């Protein structure tokens, strides 16, 4: 199969995409960076030995994929506008979250008309910890009654959190957000339900004016309460904790072992670490890059194997994410 000619728009978070696709030479031909010509962009182009484009008219017509890592329209950028321009030319688009529901609908409509793929990124679900948590949660759904879901996240990743929750329910989710509480200037809580299961999301809403991407207490936490215990993901890099329900041993010292409720002895806490002991440097340079590569590879496989029917089905279920994201963030 031929290599797909690829362009990255943006060099801030775009650096992660640049590094990831530069390590995918078996399927990607990295041809350049499109940006406003910042010093960072120039240095990136030099390091990876690719062209730097500052005018969209100068970009070659024969590119296959554009990775857009600049703010979308709803966030004050031109990412959504760029996506539509490239999609209208028959170019596949892979764009960073978040995106407004109206912007997404336009992009999806254009992609289907042109027979190309449009994807809103969420590399977190490809990290070892998040992937493990989603799979364990699916198992809980099959075997236990889910009583409640409590989440917490930074404002910047509400969109990705909603996508991760959607994966737990195998893309068959009915979201509802009904109530909001402002705790103080830094935190608010949105509550509602998913498939009639109570859902709450605590959002850290404080943004540092110097560096809006930093100084978060956490990126994403998810805590699922079931009839047998709770499954807690402390953050996207772990750990994951399974804590069974507490059961009192009222007759522990007066009855024989086989006369006691065996669940008292069988129940124990499990702790899954994987990435939680790594430094942030290791997480950024290794785990994030690996996760981005996995997501890009899946996107490229859709292109190679022309999975357009599957794409149309999945993208319709994903439209719920910007809809609920909009409800939460407009408050």
Name each model feature, range by range:
Residues 3, 8, 45-47, 65-70, ...:
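C-terminal helix-rich "cap/oligomerization" subdomain common to oxidoreductases
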Residues 100-164, 316:
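A contiguous active-site-proximal alpha/beta segment in oxidoreductase catalytic domains
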Residues 17, 48-110:
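Beta-loop-alpha module in the N-terminal Rossmann-like domain of NAD(P)-dependent dehydrogenases
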Residues 1-48:
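N-terminal Rossmann-like dinucleotide-binding module
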Residues 71-73, 123, 206:
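Short glycine-rich anion-binding loops that position phosphate/pyrophosphate groups of nucleotides
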Residues 7-9, 34, 69, 121, ...:
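Short hydrophobic segments within beta-strands
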Residues 144-228, 236-237:
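Rossmann-like dinucleotide-binding domain that binds NAD(P)(H)
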Residues 230-311:
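C-terminal glycine/acidic-rich active-site capping loop/insertion
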């Amino acid at each position: 199969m031929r290599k797909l000619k690829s362009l990255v728009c943006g060099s801030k978070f775009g650096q992660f995409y640049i590094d990831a696709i530069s390590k995918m030479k078996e399927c990607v031909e990295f041809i350049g960076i499109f940006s406003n010509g910042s010093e960072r962009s120039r240095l990136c182009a030099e390091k990876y030995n690719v062209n730097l484009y500052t005018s969209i008219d100068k970009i070659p017509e024969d590119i296959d994929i554009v990775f857009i890592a600049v703010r979308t329209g709803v966030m004050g950028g031109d990412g959504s506008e760029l996506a539509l321009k490239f999609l209208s030319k028959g170019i596949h688009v892979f764009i960073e979250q978040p995106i407004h529901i109206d912007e997404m609908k336009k992009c999806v409509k254009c992609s289907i008309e042109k027979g190309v793929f449009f994807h809103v990124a969420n590399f977190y679900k490809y990290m070892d910890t998040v992937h493990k948590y989603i799979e364990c949660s699916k198992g809980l759904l099959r075997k236990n009654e889910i009583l409640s879901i409590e989440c917490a996240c930074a404002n910047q990743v509400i969109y990705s959190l909603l996508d991760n929750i959607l994966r737990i329910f195998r893309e068959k989710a009915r979201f509802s957000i009904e109530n909001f509480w402002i705790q103080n200037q830094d935190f608010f809580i949105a509550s509602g339900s998913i498939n009639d299961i109570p859902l709450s999301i605590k959002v850290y809403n404080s943004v540092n004016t110097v560096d809006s991407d930093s100084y978060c207490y956490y990126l994403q936490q998810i805590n699922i309460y079931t009839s047998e215990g709770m499954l807690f993901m402390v953050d996207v890099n772990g750990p994951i904790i399974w804590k069974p329900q507490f059961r009192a041993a009222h007759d522990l010292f007066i009855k024989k072992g086989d006369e006691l409720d065996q669940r008292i002895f069988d129940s124990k806490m499990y702790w899954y670490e994987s990435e939680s002991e790594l430094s942030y440097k290791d997480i950024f340079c290794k785990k994030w890059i690996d996760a981005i590569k996995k997501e890009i590879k899946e996107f490229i496989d859709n292109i190679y194997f022309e999975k357009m029917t599957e794409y149309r089905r999945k993208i319709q279920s994903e439209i719920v994410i910007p809809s609920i994201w909009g409800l939460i963030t407009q408050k």
